[in-house]
Amino acid sequence: MKTNSTIIQDSHSASEYDNQARKTNWFGSEVVFGLAYEFVRSGNTVLDLGIGSGLSSILFHKAGLQVFGLDGSSEVLDICKSKGFAAGLKKHDLRDLPLPYPSRFCDHVISVAVLNSFKDLAPLFVEIARIIKAGGIFAFTVEEQKPGQEEGYAINRVEVSEKPKEETAVMLYRHSEAYIARLLSQNGFELLKTLEFVAFKYPAENKDVFFKAYVARKQELEGAGDNERY
């Protein structure tokens, strides 16, 4: 099946973003916020990579953090902007590196239901290690790759509860715990918490889709993602 970009490029899909999260009982945003809450403080800055409509970062805003966000879709950024909580938003494709932020830009980084769009996460993890301050938290989700599962599969971009159609299908990727742990270690992060949860049911296989949430702390390690760029 031919697949498309994971970036939302039409106003209808963007307008349905929040509705689909409710329809599919998606609580990944709440999971990540709950796991990260003890490590953040009011007044801290948080950068949401793939902020979308702001479902995840608005929770951090309500806890007193200053939110910055990046997304490749103008349509969902417009929706996020209309909610009026973000201190700064940028349109940028996460595949285009380096990211448009200086080194040690923010206290914390989050990325929820985004990293499963990437087959190779290594370059992005290097960038995240560069822009986060030492002691900061990187909280994110990936889809857990279980034994016997293929790494990649097709799914609808927004209507995930329906079988994939060629005009709306995108490729998503699963990642094992060992792979994520290795990337975190290589980039100077200490793993603090993990939690597996059911994200939604994938209709093409009639199986539950399991995501795993991670919370890791950036350590002050020489040569671990601290190269000055941008």
Language-model regions: role of each:
Residues 53-97:
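Class I SAM-dependent methyltransferase SAM/SAH-binding core
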Residues 108-120:
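A short SAM/SAH-binding and catalytic strip from SAM-dependent methyltransferases
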Residues 1-41, 43-52, 59, 137-167, 171:
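Conserved class I S-adenosyl-L-methionine
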Residues 122-134:
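A short glycine-rich, Lys/Arg-flanked "PGG" loop and its adjoining helix->strand segment in the class I
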Residues 171-188:
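Short alpha-helix
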Residues 99-109:
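A short acidic, Gly/Pro-enriched loop at the edge of an enzyme's catalytic core
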